[in-house]
Every structure is written in structure tokens, then in C-alpha cells.
């Protein structure tokens, strides 16, 4: 991942003085401590975007005066704006996120067919009580879900970093108690194909004609770059999905592969869940304003109460059982008997127009905040 370099503050910081420095600089305690767990000679300031370079000060007053203009605000374009991402733009955004909020941990959990990194963003809590996983862009033409998830993450990080933010105490509680795992773009090759066309990937449109048929562009494309639907790839009654559905060959949508977990993107997501065994999973898709929450009775009893809370804050309709198998959420519930939810954002035809973004975001952000309450 390319590194965005913001400024560093040269400062000798001992463990005993951390609380006092955080208070004087107006930074949330949890965010400050998690950002400065290892650094002893430089201060890392979550919620600030400092100019490049190493800056030295003789007093806390000088430091306060210097950093004041660089504090991030909820009204800032980077926090409150609407952004669209392909895989390269997402990589740059993750670098900016890490620089602005150093308590975030960013790693690569696998690679796509075309060797594009699949990133996970994590928070490591002070007291690990819960683990929650969020993902987006399993399907290529549902890339708007990445935009929604990243915008919400910025609001969470800012709220944790700045005590004057309305949701500060809620965000601090999440940082202190919850291990968050976020995969913002499961299908980077597919997103790049939909957004930029095959030439951007070094491929020709002729290669996709047998898979894509009569369509003039790639707006209908859901699958990965090999024409496998990643959300039909998981070993939860996969055979039913394979035998009852067309196509039986690679396609722009629907094809579940010749067997489960043939695709590197699906393997990466399965391995992540097997390693982490999350308490709760939220998969963002489009569209329909619905929440799928059960799978053949394998879901825990608490799911019924949780989805009622999601409905109350978002207005989305809960649906317990769906005539569908082999999805990531299906497999997660089947494998672990833990809470899993597919949230279908917005209304209309994929890919949803960005004209809907504000409406989608307002409903989804409330659901995501609620999802982090365990």
C-alpha cells in the first residue's frame, strides 16, 4: 500500500503522561493511547492532518497552537464528502485513513485473480469483548457499498478521536471493547472492470464477450474477473445453487464455480472468518432495502432481536429465510452458528446511481452504528 506521509511531532512521551497530553490536546483517550502504543519519541495525533515533516516544540502550548488549524472536522470534504472508488483509489484512501487515524491497522488478507490486494482494516480494542466483521463490494456492480462503508468508518474514527463529536462516547466504547474487521472491497478486479473497463486491466473486450453477451458496457457485471459469482462460492449447500441455476459456465453473474472456494477472493474471505470467528457479520449489498438474517435455522436466537433493532434505525425490512444458498453470510451462519446479516442498500437497478447516495448513507450509517453494539 502506498504510504501517505503527514507530519510527525517530535516529543518524548512516557506512559504516565499520555492521559495528560491527550487531554491537553483535546484528543480522545482511547484513540490517543491506541495510536501511541509503540512510539516513544514521536506523537501520533489521531484526528489531525499535519503538514509533512518532523515538527519540534519546547512546550505543550506551542504544540497546541501549531496543530489547531489541522484538526479534522465533520464538515471537512474528506470526512463528509461522497467518493467513488476503484481498487487504486481505495488503496490511496486507506493510506490517508491510516495517516489521519493511526489506531487503524491495515493489512492484506489475500489477492484477487489479477493479484490486486484485498485489504482488511482492523481496530484492536483495549479489552476484547466482541468481534464484528463488515464487508462491501462482493459484487462488482455494487461498488457503491464501498463508498458507504468508508464514509461511515471516517465518521467513527473522527468521533473516537474528538471528544466534542456527538457520538464520541459511543465510538470510544467501540474502540475499547470491539475488534472491528472491515473488508471494504472484496472483489477489486470486478469493481475495476465495471468502473474502468477491461482495457484498464490490460485485457480486451473480446475476452469477455462469451461471458458478458450482448451488453455494450460492464454495468451488469457482478462476478469476479473469471466470471465466478463470489457470493455463490461458499460451502453451505453449494450443490443446490450449482445444479438448479444457469449458467453452468463462467458468466457476468450467477455462476458459482465448478466447486466451492475455487476463487482466491472467496478463499481469502473464508480464511479470514475461520481465523477470527467473528461474533457478528454484516455484508453490504444492493438493492432492495432488506435485511436477510437467517439460514435454515442455524442462526442464533439473538439474531431475531438484533434485526429488529436494525429495522428500527434503518427502516429496512427483515427477511428471515431466502431461497438462496452458498453466500458468504449463509456459510458464516452455517459454519459458526453466529449472527450474520446481508443488508441490501437502496432501491432500483444495479449499479445504483450516486444520486441515491445521501439517502442510502443516512439509513445505513444508523444501522452500522447499531451493529457495533453488542
Regions found by a protein language model. Give the residues of each.
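Metallocarboxypeptidase
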Residues: 237-374
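Stable alpha-helical elements in mature extracytoplasmic
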Residues: 17-21, 28, 90-93, 145-152, ...
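Extracellular LysM carbohydrate-binding repeats and other cell-envelope/extracellular binding modules
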Residues: 2-10, 27-65
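Second-shell loop/turn segments in exported
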Residues: 17, 21, 77-85, 138-139, ...
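Proline/glycine-enriched tight loop/beta-turn segments at coil->beta junctions
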Residues: 116-118, 125-131
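Short glycine- and acidic-rich boundary segments immediately preceding or forming the N-terminal edge
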Residues: 55-118
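Active-site/substrate-binding loop(s) of hydrolase catalytic cores
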Residues: 144, 151-153, 157-292
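Short hydrophobic beta-strand that contains or immediately precedes a catalytic carboxylate
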Residues: 133-136
